[in-house]
Amino acid sequence: MSKKISGGSVVEMQGDEMTRIIWELIKEKLIFPYVELDLHSYDLGIENRDATNDQVTKDAAEAIKKHNVGVKCATITPDEKRVEEFKLKQMWKSPNGTIRNILGGTVFREAIICKNIPRLVSGWVKPIIIGRHAYGDQYRATDFVVPGPGKVEITYTPSDGTQKVTYLVHNFEEGGGVAMGMYNQDKSIEDFAHSSFQMALSKGWPLYLSTKNTILKKYDGRFKDIFQEIYDKQYKSQFEAQKIWYEHRLIDDMVAQAMKSEGGFIWACKNYDGDVQSDSVAQGYGSLGMMTSVLVCPDGKTVEAEAAHGTVTRHYRMYQKGQETSTNPIASIFAWTRGLAHRAKLDNNKELAFFANALEEVSIETIEAGFMTKDLAACIKGLPNVQRSDYLNTFEFMDKLGENLKIKLAQAKL
């Protein structure tokens, strides 16, 4: 390459522990030698979040709103042990949750597939992208133990002072039990629908929404009706032009269909279903280290990409002691490529789009050529059978990727 590609504005968020080390290596070896970015950096490391009373996380989210593209390194969400370890002022909330609450949108998880990494579900040759509606339902419910006989009722009191409406949930006649009231909001469901339709158009894959509307006729029926109405009014012609489709499916039918499919579709899930199915699907593809996570906002313009895994604390402890590590950087690399690909799409920047695609191809081709980290070697051979010659350490693997990227870009004569 004779000159660097002009990349435009990107918000990058640094993270914690081993992924922070890898994040710097990705920039140094794979991004900065080839792409000139207008980079807006925010340090979301746990110490800086504590020093700024978590203001840095909010600032980063506002910057993503402004520039439309964010790439995020994995971060620590502190528990009691972490509060003690870092002497934190308080147990700060998950940065992902804070950013999601500010931006809105839906998180889509997608597997990165290599031919030589075995999958538990061998028929899945293309990714299944799960979009989880991470709002409401059981996660914002009010639940309680019913101590003894009596009625549980739900009452709706209109703000305009008109008559209340009361529904009987259950009449407990013989002893107590448990009860729960949960909700969702039309606006949130509409945003979920728009994000899902935008994602399907962006990938060129069909979209399925799963509910249990045969049982929850009003509750799940609302999800089904809102999706259908938005699809018919705003997206149907675009879907037909791309020869893709949208369908509603019952959750049990959808689970069965997903297992026997070859993949290659978007699956929009309600909150609980998405929580369960995203982990189930991730395991089916073989490795969480090979899973991307992209937050897509309802406008289709604003995107934040990150790895779907944590900060790899165990490897970081080894690294601190000067011991060798073999940490998989692929999901973090794909956070960058998905962010850059979206920047390229917004700016109609063909060179940047080519670069993002080339880096993804190099990552997969390198693994398929037999150069990989220890976790992937373990997927192929089983951990007890892995020898040192089967894998590269963290830094060797990054060097190998850098070497292969250089060759690919030189051949492309960009």
From Swiss-Prot:
Family: Belongs to the isocitrate and isopropylmalate dehydrogenases family.
Function: Catalyzes the NADP(+)-dependent oxidative decarboxylation of isocitrate (D-threo-isocitrate) to 2-ketoglutarate (2-oxoglutarate), which is required by other enzymes such as the phytanoyl-CoA dioxygenase. Plays a critical role in the generation of NADPH, an important cofactor in many biosynthesis pathways. May act as a corneal epithelial crystallin and may be involved in maintaining corneal epithelial transparency.
Known cofactor(s): Mg(2+); Mn(2+)
InterPro entries according to UniProt: IsoCit/isopropylmalate_DH_CS, Isocitrate_DH_NADP, IsoPropMal-DH-like_dom
Modification sites for N6-succinyllysine: K126, K400
PANTHER family, sorted: ISOCITRATE DEHYDROGENASE [NADP] CYTOPLASMIC, NADP-SPECIFIC ISOCITRATE DEHYDROGENASE
Record-linked Pfam families: Iso_dh (PF00180)
PTM section of the record: Acetylation at Lys-374 dramatically reduces catalytic activity.
Protein name: Isocitrate dehydrogenase [NADP] cytoplasmic
Chemical reaction(s) catalysed: D-threo-isocitrate + NADP(+) = 2-oxoglutarate + CO2 + NADPH
SUPFAM superfamilies (UniProt xref): Isocitrate/Isopropylmalate dehydrogenase-like
One Gene Ontology CC term in the entry: cytosol
Assembly information from the UniProt record: Homodimer.
A single GO BP: NADPH regeneration
Note on cofactor: Binds 1 Mg(2+) or Mn(2+) ion per subunit.
Gene name of the encoded protein: IDH1
Modification type N-acetylserine: residues: S2
Residues holding Mn(2+): D252, D275, D279
